[in-house]
């Protein structure tokens, strides 16, 4: 099950339609009871994976943890996708305690300057890379989420990302 419950984001990625915390696309959220019913039905039907996506989920941690509580992650291989900007050690610990199994962190390049330029925010690369380490430290599966586009498809960046992921024993 893939659940996109938040379209707000703190970055301005050149390729992403979800590039603003303002606008009609961020006003409505599924209520927690609907999410709980969806998770219960998924569990009854034998689904074993649940993926939370956004926007940036860690931008609104209180909502994220209410959603996790509604889902009851212990029933699933629970994972979420983040740009990693707010994925500090304390957040990684909270996610692990909430029974999140895997955290996918979006990285566009092993070159910090290129990644930050694509993402539209200085320090986004450094914080994302640190976030991956925090995920691993707290026993969750770190995962590189790589978006491929014209800006990196014909460069060494993809190979560098894959080699790094393998060297770090990321999924």
List where the protein language model places each region:
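Generic structural signal for individual residues within well-ordered alpha-helical segments
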Residues: 36, 65, 93, 116, ...
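Short intrinsically disordered, low-complexity coil segments enriched in acidic
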Residues: 1-5, 27-30, 116, 163, ...
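Alpha-helix N-cap and loop-to-helix initiation/capping positions
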Residues: 26-30, 119-124, 153-156
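Conserved alpha-helical substructure of the radical SAM core
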Residues: 1-102
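Glycine-rich, phosphate-binding/catalytic loops in enzymes
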Residues: 68-70, 96-98, 120-124, 160-163
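Glycine-centered loop/turn positions within well-structured domains
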Residues: 11, 112-113, 142
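Conserved C-terminal portion of the radical SAM core fold
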Residues: 45-53, 74-79, 101-104, 126-171
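Conserved radical SAM core fold
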Residues: 57-59, 84-89, 104-122, 148-152
